[in-house]
Amino acid sequence: MAGAKEIRSKIASIKSTQKITSAMEKVAVSKMRKAQLRMAASRPYAERIRQVIGHLAKANPEYKHPFMVERPVKRVGYILVSTDRGLCGGLNINLFKALIKSMKEWHDKGVEADFCVIGNKGASFFRSYGGNVVAAIGNLGEEPSINSLIGSIKVMLDAFHEGRVDRLYLASNKFINTMTQKPVVEQLLPLAASDDEGVQKGTWDYLYEPNAQQLLDALLVRYMESQVYQAVVENGAAEQAARMIAMKNATDNAGELISDLQLVYNKARQAAITQEISEIVGGAAAV
């Protein structure tokens, strides 16, 4: 059994770590709430663009933008949204597993992939796993800007437009609630037909200038950018929620470990006192 002094030192060390994890939990709660607000603020913009695109496409069925045309798949592209930092449980690992599953399905069909990586953890993953990374960006901070993402997104959109990739996916974590984050791999391009009720009913009657086709060309690019930005913001909220849970579990585990060590310390101290008493009694008897 370890000595009382050694156990005391270990308890003090764990208490110090517990204070750090507790503070990190509180910081994560605050950051998660801010990320949720950003997520809620950006969603209406993306939804409205989607509705307008759906209306434009329905009103001009003869015009087919390349982003809306299905074609035989010879190569696919992925935009991966990961975190810049760790200490967020299995958030990134679960996302990488979902991505690898999708990649394997295409690889089995003889289809290779290109990647755009957002976040340092994703870049680290591809350094060890391998893959054709054509664009990468990291260190976006707590409040990512869509302007920071446009360059990397454009690389993948141009690749699709020029026929270098035939299908484009977005891999990120969905923020379901504080306790649940879900890794998803969703198809970005070609864009699926809208199932929005307002679009299907055809209740809108707008005039578009300079013309509907030019507007559709511009809006489709903006929509793709907004979808990726929304994924980055939502992934940020999922990251903070996962970090909050991880730090709470670490704090709770530290508390349990301290209790166990305190019990061991008390037993060690009791054994030491008992031994001292035995030695005193033995010495007195010898006299």
Curated annotation (Swiss-Prot):
GO terms for biological process: proton motive force-driven plasma membrane ATP synthesis. Disulfide bonds: none annotated. One of its GO terms (cellular component) is plasma membrane. Its main location: membrane. It is a peripheral membrane protein. Transmembrane segments: none annotated. It is found in: Cell inner membrane. Belongs to the ATPase gamma chain family. F-type ATPases have 2 components, CF(1) - the catalytic core - and CF(0) - the membrane proton channel. CF(1) has five subunits: alpha(3), beta(3), gamma(1), delta(1), epsilon(1). CF(0) has three main subunits: a, b and c. Produces ATP from ADP in the presence of a proton gradient across the membrane. The gamma chain is believed to be important in regulating ATPase activity and the flow of protons through the CF(0) complex. This is ATP synthase gamma chain.
